[in-house]
Amino acid sequence: MKKLIILGIVLGISLSGCKKDEPAPVQDNEFISTMRLTFTEGTNKLVYSIKDLDGDGGNAPVIDVIKLLPNKTYTFTTEFLDETKNPAVNLTSEIKAESAEHLVIFEPNSTNLLSVTRTDKDSRNFEVGLMATAKTTTAANGTMKVTLKHQPEVGGQPTKNGTATIGTTDFEGTFKVEIK
């Protein structure tokens, strides 16, 4: 009988000392309502944006048409904002600080429309895309999809490898583009 009591106590202590490991907390992404591209050619600045203040679903986003001149090279920046807050919160500096976990992808629907080259790099020498150049060719119309990918570390190891296939989409939108 004593053995059963002792066994019960030992079993109770050993079971109460075991607990499941809690999963690592998932980092919530900030809400991004607006993506803004600012093109510069010489002294001319052109600003275009996609605004989706209510997120996926609900109202359709407001999307500017990018209008550029043919046979020009533009430098441009990409910014991400949360304009649902007052004042609006510019999230670009946070993305830049975490550049080893982010990639902006530019996908013109035709190379005859324009070509985009990312010009900024992260600490591992992978492109980021907050700064870029765009080269236009002849007059043309088309689209350009812009995607911000979040490519966080997994198990303390970086996942970003310079490709768009890894990670989750933080923001995505497609601009109409007119070169004329």
Range-by-range predicted roles:
Residues 1-4:
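Positively charged n-region of N-terminal signal peptides that target proteins for export
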